[in-house]
């Protein structure tokens, strides 16, 4: 079921792949390109999201909604998805508004599955 949500998400222009990883770093579902090591990305995304959550709490920002890593060749966006974290890999030049809305809708569907 989660895989269907990810496949639909991946149809969004600019999205190269997506996955859901547990807060413990274990991969729950993945629709990433074959060249990407899902287990490694999952573990690192979980650690990055956890650090961002702690930072947001420490500086009084409230609940973390999203974190983004931006590089020369693309972006990695992460949002809370209940028991997991929705991770999306994108091209460098994307419509971030569209990506964020699409991710939020997908995360809500995923939350309902846990």
Swiss-Prot record:
MF annotations from Gene Ontology: guanyl-nucleotide exchange factor activity; molecular adaptor activity
Superkingdom of this protein's organism: Archaea
Gene Ontology process terms (BP): cellular response to amino acid stimulus; positive regulation of TOR signaling
Recorded family membership: To M.jannaschii MJ0310 and MJ0714.
PANTHER family tied to this protein: LATE ENDOSOMAL/LYSOSOMAL MP1 INTERACTING PROTEIN
Protein name: Uncharacterized protein MJ1340
Organism: Methanocaldococcus jannaschii (strain ATCC 43067 / DSM 2661 / JAL-1 / JCM 10045 / NBRC 100440)
